[in-house]
């Protein structure tokens, strides 16, 4: 079982790869690619023609296919060719070197500022304006912020599947733990509840009391404690006092349940996506999950007893934290106009409504539960919920779904930084060494800050700031 439970984890994008990309990309180094069917970089037109090559978007399920079909039809007579494999920095480097980049790429939102800083993708403000879309209102604020760099928007966000606590009511009842004891605004109370629900057999965990998804969701917990991995400009702030407090709590939580290594080993043995998942087997008291995991659990809806709890900061404020992907247009794209039109249409209200209809049909065929779609767009989320999310016959799952929707009221994300991948990696490493006892939390974060700061100083923003 993976310790990182964001559905779409950030691609590993090393600085050396990006430097190579900048060196070999003609658009990033002052050259230009001859556009086909549109004007050049930064210029968009509704007069569509030529071929559109996309990379990273995979219409493998009904949600993706319905959106893709609608967008592909909208860009006609331009023809669409898809490379459905995930974005890969090395592959993109080779494409840039040959001058054959895709016209449209799908990437994790956290690396959009990195690509923008290196001049590898182009700002989309003119694209949005052409089609009458205001990203500030079309998408959740945190999603738009993630793809904004130096005041310009470089991506078209998709999905915002917020994190929440999903607890096993059977384990809670056996331990005498109530739902209000899982209030994350009271971190010491969480540790106490974890201790009550934790069980061991033969010196090894048999029930994890509270799994905070570490190090995968470390940044979420920094924000719970009022901290952040970076400042408003994207500069790393890993060694800030609030972050040290957060990591100290993470260590305390793990130590209260047999220690990080033992918990990780036990979690790795869990059948998280199968019919014998940890909620079926009552192997966990509570866990942090993205909204999408409700879909996984629905396959075993008759075997689990669960309750959802929203995540709050220590000052009691709701925290709807999520990552996600974005569509971006390479600077050297040959058909940016078709790419722009496709991306805007694929994330339009019409596209998400079509996706909602397609998901509803699948849910009906499988006799499953419709948990809604968390699209990244408030209007689309509401439209799909109003049309398709109805009482499921399971009070537990209705409560989970309602809780998930409630987390969208106040959105948050990792942030926007040209050194985002390096900051994320440094944080993950710091959490791992602190939880394992190799370093104390303050030292681990101090060392992580030094590593992340070096990466920041090699970005254009870092050199200029």
What is the role of each PLM region?
Residues 90-101, 118, 171-172, 191-200, ...:
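Short helices/loops that flank or line small-molecule/ion binding pockets
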Residues 110-162, 307-308, 465:
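Hinge/lid segment of periplasmic solute-binding proteins
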Residues 89, 227-311, 444:
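Extracytoplasmic ligand-binding clamshell segments of periplasmic binding protein
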Residues 84-92, 110, 184-191, 264-277, ...:
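Short helix-initiation/N-cap motifs at beta->coil->alpha
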Residues 293-303, 315-321, 329-425, 463-464:
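C-terminal lobe and pocket-closing loops
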Residues 2-114, 350-354, 438-443, 447-465:
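Conserved N-terminal structural module of periplasmic/extracytoplasmic solute-binding proteins
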Residues 129, 148-216, 228-265, 329-337, ...:
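Helix-loop-helix "hinge/cap" segment bordering the ligand-binding cleft or interdomain interface
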